[in-house]
């Protein structure tokens, strides 16, 4: 049920903002009855503008990795804010952060910073083209790399020319990738691939060792650049980079979401051989040297390493996954859980239009758990046992409601 304050804000927004909001957080993309506007957050919980509190399993769609308003992160941000944020050049923290990131990410010899994931993936593509002098970029069908004209999933406002040098392949299919490489011929600049397959409304897939090895080998054979888009998964799965457990080192990686625990920042890391090309491309923005977000990122990365946050999140996510599996079996509902436990996706068998997913999420929301019916969710390090148990207390009757809907047709 949409609260009165939220409803009033939607009406006001509709008068002054096209569509009421832009992008993936607009109300039309949410289940009916979901709040659009929020007042604040603390730890693993958020409060909407009507004062209702939820255990948050979206974590601001990924940026919250330690928990909302994490004390160490906010203290670092406030200390830098007292000195200044946007100055005539970057603060000392820029170098501190770059050194920390290079020391953490396995393949990294250098780092550059931006504001959003799209900034980072676009910079990676530009660096690859500058380094190779070539144009073609291979992308997986259905993958999301941002909202710039070359990669946005919605074609409004773009032209065919924006994508004329992209060639598609199928994720986790080495043969499809090899065919795309052959199609690019001598004009292959880069292969860009998400750390895992996390397309909207389909089961997630971790990259297979065979696929990752093929991407690495084919890039090397053709003198092309292998880019891992780690914007969504970075620092949740592995602090060294999400493909480190596979033994694969990309040439470039793009990071954003979890890097600064909700403060606006993105990063590109790269190997030594691309340093010169990276220095030649012109990428910049009015707020790209903002010192406050960099101070927050430095504190975030240190805390992630101190507590081994990926393991903490994996444990919480597995507790949730195991509990949901038991509940779904008891309810007699076909629930598919996919992806790493830190980034769970829940889909129902036969639910092509996601009506069961929307019903499930509405019922859980009414009981204090904020989930999503077709987008992967995100765990953070603040999700303790009590929070996961609270989610499971909400999902059990929600699954029962799904079972009733199935029986009633």
Q: Which positions does each model-derived feature cover?
A:
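Conserved N-terminal phosphate-binding loop of PLP-dependent enzymes in the Aspartate aminotransferase
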Residues: 1-409
């Amino acid at each position: 049920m949409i609260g009165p304050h939220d409803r009033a804000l939607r009406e006001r927004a509709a008068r002054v903002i096209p569509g009421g909001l832009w992008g993936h957080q607009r109300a039309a993309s949410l289940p009916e009855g979901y709040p659009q506007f929020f007042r604040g957050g603390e730890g693993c919980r958020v409060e909407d503008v009507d004062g209702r509190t939820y255990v948050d399993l979206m974590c601001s769609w990924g940026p919250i990795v330690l928990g909302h308003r994490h004390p160490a992160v906010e203290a670092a941000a406030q200390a830098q804010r007292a000195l200044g944020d946007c100055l005539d050049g970057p603060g000392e923290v820029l170098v501190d952060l770059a050194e920390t990131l290079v020391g953490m990410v396995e393949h990294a010899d250098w780092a550059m910073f931006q504001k959003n994931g799209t900034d980072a993936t676009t910079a990676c593509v530009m660096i690859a083209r500058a380094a190779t002098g070539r144009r073609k970029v291979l992308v997986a069908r259905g993958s999301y790399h941002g909202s710039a004209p070359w990669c946005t999933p919605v074609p409004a406002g773009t032209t065919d020319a924006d994508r004329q040098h992209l060639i598609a392949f199928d994720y986790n299919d080495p043969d499809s990738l090899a065919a795309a490489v052959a199609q690019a011929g001598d004009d292959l600049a880069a292969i860009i691939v998400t750390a895992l397959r996390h397309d909207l409304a389909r089961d997630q897939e971790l990259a297979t060792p065979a696929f990752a090895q093929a991407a690495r080998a084919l890039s090397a054979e053709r003198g092309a650049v292998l880019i891992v888009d780690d914007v969504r998964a970075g620092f949740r799965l592995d602090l060294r980079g999400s493909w480190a457990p596979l033994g694969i080192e990309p040439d470039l990686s793009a990071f954003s979401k979890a890097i600064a625990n909700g403060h606006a920042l993105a990063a590109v890391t790269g190997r030594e051989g691309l340093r010169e090309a990276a220095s030649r491309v012109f990428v910049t923005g009015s707020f790209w040297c903002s010192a406050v977000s960099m101070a927050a990122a430095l504190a975030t990365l240190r805390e992630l390493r101190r507590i081994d946050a990926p393991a903490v999140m994996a444990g919480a996510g597995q507790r949730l996954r195991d509990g949901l599996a038991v509940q779904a079996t008891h309810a007699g509902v076909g629930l598919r859980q996919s992806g790493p436990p830190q980034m769970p996706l829940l889909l129902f068998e036969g639910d092509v239009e996601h009506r069961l997913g929307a019903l499930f999420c509405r019922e859980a929301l009414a009981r204090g758990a904020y989930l999503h019916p077709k987008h992967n969710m995100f765990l953070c390090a603040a999700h303790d046992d009590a929070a996961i148990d609270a989610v499971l207390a909400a999902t059990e009757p929600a699954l029962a409601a799904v079972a009733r809907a199935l029986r009633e047709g």
